[in-house]
Amino acid sequence: MSPLRRFRRTALSVCLLGLLAGCGRPAPQRPPETVRDLIADLDLAEIQREPGVVDLGTPGARTLLRKGWSTDEGDASHHFVWSDGPESEIVFFLAAARDIPLILKGSPYPAPGAPAQAVTLLLNGTSVGRVTISGEEARTVLPEKALRSGENRLVLRYAWTRSPFEESGGKSDDHRRLAVAWDLLRFATGVDEQGRVRGAGGQLSLPFGWRIDSFQRLPPGAVLAMDDLRSRGGETGELRVALQPEGGAEREVGRLQPGSGPVVLPLGDAGTGPARLSLTALSGKQGGNGLVLWRPVLAAPHAPKATAAIPQTATAVPASLRPAAGPRPRNVILYLVDALRADHLGCYGYSRPVSPHIDAFARQAVLFRHTVAQSSWTRPATTTILTGLLPRTHGVNGRRDKLSEQALTLAEMLQARGYHTAGFVTNGNVARSFGLGQGFETYELLPRKHSAATDVNAAAAGWLESGWKRDAPFFLYLHTVEPHAPYTPPAPFRQRFAPEVHDETLTGMRVFHRLEDGSLAPTPELRQSLLDLYDAEIAANDAAFGELIDLLARRGLWEDTVVVFISDHGEELFEHGGWEHGKTLHSEVLDVPLIVRAPGAGARTVQRQVQQVDVAPTILDLLGLPIPPVVEGRSLAPWILGQAPGDDPDAEAYSWLDQHGFRAASVTTPAWRLIEDRAPNAGRSLYDRQADPGEHRDLADERAVRTGYLRAHLLAAERRRKGALQAGTAVFDEELRKQLQALGYLR
């Protein structure tokens, strides 16, 4: 009998018992809904196992290391990792608390005259002994009384540290505080290190000493159901089932014995937020193979369909929220300002008066307060804006990636409806060579000179005068490069916003290269100078944007044109230890402005979180044109026209970074941002966007349930979209190469 059939029968039996007790006729029972198929969604779960040999200096060991460790070193024959600082921390999982023998091997820093390196072991905050590290194996036992089922923290506290810089009298540039070069840790847990969690053919195999964590919201009445639980290799063992609601303590729900037939285990109250369901295979004795769960699912009698699935990006807008029929604007201008942070505009709360024309435009438009970029560098983000596809779908993520000809761009969609299309761009990353000219009758990469935004205006004015045939509406894409580095504002704006900056080397790319390689220190004075130059460039672009608005008014186009003002990404100004963009996925590079002026729409501020992928469907909707099914964004036209509700606390935006050695992914909600750094030896971080908008306090460990829940959503988004389009490889001509070098993308 299947677990769901058994669940229905159990529910019916309860009602029959109620009848016998005189409770009246039972209400009809709905079949239970599957909240999660634990085999189908195994790739969304987190899997842990008890530690065995931790080979320090290898990527595999990094999953256990937290603070107090340097980078991996060595070669194929010998690898190690230095401690860095007075303590090093290790986090490891145990299926069950018990005495664990531990072997430690490392070599102390070779400091002349230094005493023996004594290392104190603190386990979950309790001192459990001391070992001397001498290059040979040191042995101890981690006592059961200080251990616990689940996560454990082991801190290695060193008797002394030394700095190579100080030891060499300043000749070394190594400022680390070193104590031990660690080779290995060996936990004698008896875990099968070659084991693996497998899910296939309706069977979920879980080795002893391993755990599966599944993250989801559970509706009332949720149960764990499976056809059977069996053991492998003759071991007895049992399955420990535990549940941890967000913000609450983990509680054991039950222990299941193999061979007892179909299972329906009520999970109890999980609250309304995310919860972690943990399944741990416990051995009846040390060693053994593990357990097999047959067709395991999470189910509930009245689970809403939305609970069962990871939220999808939606393009459809309910009929009740569709824009009302009536006159439609004819033309569209997409004005993109490269590398512009939202928080450096007055209309977004910035105190310096760098954006009076943009602010005036915002007062007669719809300002989206929270807009998330799909990447932190130009090409993937702009490709998303121009296609309505997420980076994992359009495939344009790397330095040489070119948009597939199979992709359908916004320009092509409008061209097919009779629109004249033109694009004038100033960043080589969106040159025709990268496929972004698809659907444009005219598409020009302008050379950078003077104020690039002014050049763009001149090109646009010329096209409106002589290139645009007034027999049909137009779509005009204008991509301005300032305030993208290098910061070279025109003299009037530099004199106003950066009058104290006299060092001309700050207006080239070399200053950023030196900051990156450490040959130039980011002093407060230097940081302020660069910030002033950045603001001066914003002011220059603002003035040019004001001229464009005046041009539209003079040409009689203002009342018949949708104007979309947006940025591709922001700019880091050393908030997280770096400069520019394309290196992280923090707020300063992902939070961008989006201001839309649609004739007749009025002015308002929308608090709902939106994202760049929404721009293309929004433009189509405002024009009264159909949105192709391939488009992944959601039309914002109902919010622009004041016909939709406000905030959505569960709205999610996904962003990716995969270029020049920087690899990361993130999911952003109005309350949280999870960043998963996918570089070697990296991890994940979680930030409370309300309490910590600057994203400086990592809560990933403290809020592990929320972290796992958001990560599952991120992985599900990637699973749905991976490999949708295959990017091509771009070919650079010499002129494009020079442009990319000038912007710092090539050296």
Language model: regions and residue ranges:
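Bacterial N-terminal signal peptides
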Residues: 11-21
